[in-house]
Amino acid sequence: MSDPHSFLGCVRRGLRFDMFKDVARQYPVIFCIFTVMISSTIILNQYLHILMVFWSFLAGVITFYCSLSPEYLLPNILISIKTKRKPQEQHELFPLGHSCAVCGKNQCKRHRPTLLLENYQPWLNLKVPSKVDASISEVLELVLENFVYPWYRDITDDEACVDELRQTIRFFAAVLAHRAQRVDVPSVVMDKMMKAAMKHIEIIAKAQQKVRNTDGLEQAALAEYGADLHVALRSRKDELLYLRKLTELLFPYVMPPKATDCRSLALLIREVMTGSVFLPIMDFVADPDTVNHMVLIFIDDSPPEPVTDPPSTLVPFLERFADPRTKKSSVLKLDLKEIREQQDLLFRFMSFLKEEGAVHVLQFCLTVEEFNDRILCPDLSDDEKQRLHEEVKKIYETYCLEESIDKISFDPFIIEEIHSIAEGPYTGVVKLQTMRCLFEAYEHVLCLLEKVFTPMFCHSDEYFRHLLCGAESPARNSKLNRNTSKRGESFGISRIGSKIKGVFKSSTMEGAMLPQYAMIEGEDDTVEEAVMVFEDDSPGPMDAVGTPGTLRNLSAWTISIPYVDFYDDEVKKERIPVFCIDVERNDRKNVGHETESWSVYRKYVEFYVLESKLTEFHGPFQDAQLPSKRIIGPKNYEFLSSKRGEFEEYLQKLLHHPELSNSQLLADFLSPFSMESQFRDKMLPDVNLGKIFKSVPGKLIKEKGQNLEPFIQSFFSSCESPKPKPSRPELTILSPTAENNKKLFNELYRNNANLPEGLEKKHNQNYFMELMEVDGAYDYMMYIGRVVFRMPDWLHHLLSGVRILLKRTLEAYVGHYFQYKLEQIMEEHRLVSLVTLLRDAVFCESTEERSPEDKQRRAKQTFEEMMNYLPDIVGKCIGEEAKYDGVKMLFNTIQQPLLNKQMTYVLLDIAIQELFPELSKNQKQGLSVSTRWM
């Protein structure tokens, strides 16, 4: 016998109780009145003649209300068609709509977004039919074969770089597929895209009134657009620049985390995708012959061809395409076993996990390994069982509880079984010897470490710092002594040359090697030996900043610059304003030390010396930068006071930067016992005009006119500001093929609108949109009938009256019909056909193009099908001549290539904003100029 709950569920679905619930929630008063009336009619059916009076009164009230309230619309009367609700907006931190890979929470604030498995591997749980996957793979293979391999094979036969490019392309395609699944396509098309189409039709209608034939329609419409013309239509060069800019804006969302840090890879992908893929696709889509073909497909009412082949099996998205072709393993690749076997690598791996907020993932793995070693002992005493039971409780509370900050996402059955052991008697802990829960939890975490964090570590700065600095452990370096360092001592790849010997000895850890910056004039070519800097080499008061053997954590320090004070400079014999820095150290409480505090006085220039040294060691910090240094002008008390807040914020950001958490250089800057000469401004001298004017006459007297000309030239050169460094090389080609000019300039589009640069146009008025808001398929139908087909006034008034009764019903039907058509297009054999057409359009350039006669034949067929698509009753209502003129106008509209391209880019902007709503919140200037009237 079936379950009564399932039977009631079937009855509920059959009677559509959910629909009645929605109606009751939306119209509570009307629903209550109708419920009372229907109940009274059923119960008191012998008094039906009396109840008819109330039914008539109710019908009259509703009719009178609807007549006096044109804004009121009757709900959809097609019960079988239910409007699809838009998906709720996903949390910005997790754009793919999945929970955190570590703790499982959907709004995790602890872990970084890169920890999201679907963000790092978006093809997870994404499967497509094998035929569709093969078609897409074929197109992507042609992209590589035509635009990458021709020049790459001249450099090397190694496929490693192309394999990385394959992974990046797979990532890009998977992100688009995931985001497309979240978009309510019928709603977007019927709302935003149809509004854009109505605007386009309005422009065409106004332009047609100004020309006598279709030859000048395109130019008149472009002029009518005015400033609303899409920026990509100004010229072919602007079109290419727009696609480049759009591609760069999408890089952070469609490429793997930190992939854009590699500028060369980003430029390569941008140029290949922009010039060789996106531009030909836009040309293909806007081609009138292509538009005619799409119109024929859409209005074709013939039944679809029966599918002869059975559905193909589902396969992981682009898995075969992304399979590495090279058989050689990278020498830089690591696995988790190698990391754990080397103490220094393990230390750096833990530092990396700390930056990612995932140290507890590795800690869980180590804890379970130790726990398994103990619980698998055959003879366990009661004391050992109690201790193991306490450990199980701790594991559950730390890694399984929802409110725990170290929660790891496990399957529910794992959490339930661990919970049952933790809450049960301690003797039940031996069940874990045979239960699957702990073993599967361990396998899950181990897979997380091996498949996600280990590859991320191999691409991290921490790992490459290990490769550069060798295998010396920072903890072991801190035990060395300055006197034991010998000239010429180096490690790792720092043996390459003596000129860079001191650079690779630097590190941010305690006991790092810092190069000597005090350079003697005239010895620019010499390379000084690096000096070991230790806090414990200083006298007793140095203990306030560091303790031998204790790892420093600058992120636990707090600083402030409360005021600006004066300092007596014994050399210059004057009082100099300095910043007073109050420092509080709180990172040694776990070893028994109380909070320590002191004050440090630093000059204005010393901050810039610190920034220069940190930049040389670690590169620039984009989130922590000093304001521009004042070179000429007084640096008095008032000036320093105005900069106090900015300098304080700069130091606070440095302290919280993970890479500087144990920086010796930053600790010395905040220490009152650092070397006096360490932050002198010899590397950043101020421009002293007085010294220049005093020194030049002396040099001229000393030279006595000898070699005066080269001296004056060198003097002028020294007074000029340094020339700016050349910017990053910018690729300006489409692709390394001979077809560049053909793709950028062709006979169909020529130079697009061919507008001169800097031309400003005023916005044209929109007479229709200012009078009435057009919303929904019913309003679009009325607008097209009024503007395109010039329907008579009586029909317009009739449709306006019927609008109250049928607007929502018609729009529900149109949405349902569009969804049905979309599902037909998304069928396997049709998707394969569409991808094949795209492949032929982009890559089959050597084959014969369609002849003008073929295009003319298709255009004629399109016009005839458009005429036949409208029912005969339309011609009877508006007249056959008006019907012919309206269809002719719509047909002429899609025969203009530049107008098609304008519409294509407008629709592209809408699609991009729907796929990537983050761009709408942080919309950059120039992304879209066509959304003003949407």
Swiss-Prot record:
GO cellular component terms, A-Z: dendrite; late endosome; late endosome membrane; lysosomal membrane; lysosome
Q: Please give, as recorded in its UniProt entry, the membrane topology of this protein.
A: Multi-pass membrane protein
Annotated PXA domain ranges read 129-303
Q: Where is the PX domain?
A: 557-677
Q: Does the keyword Transmembrane apply?
A: yes
User: Which BP terms from GO are recorded?
Assistant: autophagosome maturation; autophagy; cerebellar Purkinje cell layer development; hindbrain development
Q: What happens when the gene is disrupted?
A: Loss of neural tissue volume: neuronal cell death is associated with impaired autophagic degradation.
- CDD domains linked to this entry: PX_SNX14, RGS_SNX14
The UniProt keyword set, sorted, is: Cell projection, Endosome, Lysosome, Membrane, Transmembrane, Transmembrane helix
The family database entries (InterPro entries) matched by this protein are listed as:
Phox_assoc, PX_dom, PX_dom_sf, RGS, RGS_sf, RGS_subdomain_2, SNX14_PX, SNX14_RGS
Domain of life assignment: Eukaryota
Q: Name one GO molecular function term.
A: phosphatidylinositol binding
Chain segments annotated as transmembrane? 27-47, 48-68
Localization per record:
Lysosome membrane; Late endosome membrane; Cell projection, Dendrite
The family assignment reads: Belongs to the sorting nexin family.
Function statement: Plays a role in maintaining normal neuronal excitability and synaptic transmission. May be involved in several stages of intracellular trafficking. Required for autophagosome clearance, possibly by mediating the fusion of lysosomes with autophagosomes. Binds phosphatidylinositol 3,5-bisphosphate (PtdIns(3,5)P2), a key component of late endosomes/lysosomes. Does not bind phosphatidylinositol 3-phosphate (PtdIns(3P)).
> What is this protein called in UniProt?
Sorting nexin-14
Lineage, highest ranks first: Eukaryota, Metazoa, Chordata, Craniata, Vertebrata
